[in-house]
Regions:
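Hydrophobic transmembrane helix segments
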Residues: 4-53
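Alpha-helical transmembrane segments of polytopic membrane proteins
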Residues: 45-55, 101-110
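Membrane-helix boundary connector in multi-pass membrane proteins
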Residues: 70-73, 77-80, 84-105
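Membrane-water interface at the C-terminal end of transmembrane alpha helices
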Residues: 109-129
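Conserved binding/catalytic microenvironments
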Residues: 26, 55, 61, 98
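Interfacial segments of alpha-helical transmembrane regions
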Residues: 2-12, 72-79
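Juxtamembrane helix-break-helix junctions at the cytosolic face
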Residues: 59-74
Length: 129
């Protein structure tokens, strides 16, 4: 079970790192030079700081549930939803931009969601809910 905890802590750390980056200078998370168009993530970020909040919630849920060894499956499922939402917004937004926006971050986010889903299954197989 130590391996599951280690990976869960690392995954929580990745979400919390994104929060810190989002709260830092915008040059750390926004790519200039896409043109006058804005991505879907930027549109939502301009309304409210949704993504720092979502990544904080996801990271803290995974961190605390792993420490307590309770609710880990649900925490990873929530984190998977956050990463999938973020990744899909990046990828779908890139489709509509001319020229298309880079999709690397969106692709990484989708795979992070898949890894969180896999971790939720791995914890469930260990009998931890």
């Amino acid at each position: 079970m130590r391996g599951l905890k280690f990976v869960s802590y690392a995954m929580a750390g990745s979400a919390l790192t994104l929060t810190v980056l989002y709260l830092g200078p915008s040059a750390l998370v926004r790519r200039e030079g896409i043109g006058p168009q804005t991505t879907l993530v930027q549109v939502i970020d301009d309304i409210a700081p949704v993504f720092p909040l979502l990544f904080t919630i996801a990271g803290m849920l995974v961190l605390v549930s792993t420490l307590r060894t309770r609710g880990v499956v649900i925490a990873h499922a929530v984190a998977a939803g956050v990463w999938m939402f973020y990744g899909l917004l990046i990828l779908l937004g890139a489709i509509f931009l001319e020229p298309p926006a880079p999709v690397l971050t969106g692709t990484i986010s989708i795979w992070a969601a898949v890894m969180h889903w896999g971790m939720s299954r791995a914890w469930a197989e260990q009998g931890v809910r």
